């Protein structure tokens, strides 16, 4: 099992009638069955759950709908604890509380995080950072030093939390009007997150090449009728 894992949603296209069919605006596959998938960084799926509606989700464990699903998938996939596995998730799942729990399990985790889930972490406000130049950043550790939250300004402002990574700064290439390619500061935490997060997308790309079409069942003729 690859040490780098990621959890994300994956869509199976379907245009027939079914109570579990979802519509997600703005996605490459807008109609179909939504799955929560746990994948290795090379695209192999380790575990998945088909989304059947809010009322059919996992038993609440106190981390919110997304966070509970993370714990559920890791448990079903029998991901070993304290073995150096790294998990990358997006802001649907991440909370400081979840990061603490996964740290206690020895699962190193980084994930983009919504402003309402950072537990009043005193970072510079998003509205203020939107006015700053690209590459600006801010960070804070929790009082016990176990959870790091970083906020970075690119075209938009993004926040990311981690229970294992550091706040060191690297650079990334961006294009500026009238200047061409330029280098701007970027937290290495975000660079490592971007490298580790693509397992589900890679699987979707490979599946799309050999996808089988799902047809809606049709009612056959009854020979006794007519």
Each language-model region and where it sits:
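Acidic, contiguous segments within the catalytic cores of piggyBac-derived transposases
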Residues: 1-226
């Amino acid at each position: 099992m690859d040490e780098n894992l990621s959890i994300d949603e994956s869509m199976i296209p379907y245009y027939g009638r079914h109570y579990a069919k979802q519509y997600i605006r703005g996605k490459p596959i807008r109609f179909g069955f939504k799955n929560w998938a746990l994948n290795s960084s090379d695209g192999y799926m380790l575990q998945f759950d088909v989304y059947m509606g809010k009322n059919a989700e996992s038993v609440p464990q106190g981390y919110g709908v997304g966070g509970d699903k993370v714990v559920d998938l890791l448990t079903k996939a029998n991901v070993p604890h304290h073995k150096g596995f790294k998990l990358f998730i997006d802001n649907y799942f991440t909370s400081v509380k979840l990061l603490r729990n996964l740290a206690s399990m020895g699962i190193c985790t980084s994930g983009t995080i919504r402003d309402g889930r950072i537990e009043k972490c005193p970072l510079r406000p998003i509205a203020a950072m939107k006015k700053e130049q690209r590459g600006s950043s801010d960070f804070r550790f929790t009082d016990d030093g176990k959870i790091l939250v970083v906020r970075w300004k690119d075209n938009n402002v993004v926040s990311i939390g981690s229970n294992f990574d550091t706040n060191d700064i690297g650079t990334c290439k961006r294009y500026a009007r009238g200047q061409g390619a330029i280098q701007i500061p970027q937290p290495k935490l975000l660079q490592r997150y971007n490298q580790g997060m693509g397992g589900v997308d890679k699987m979707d790309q490979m599946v799309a090449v050999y996808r089988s079409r799902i047809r809606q069942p049709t009612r056959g003729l009854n020979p006794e009728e007519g």
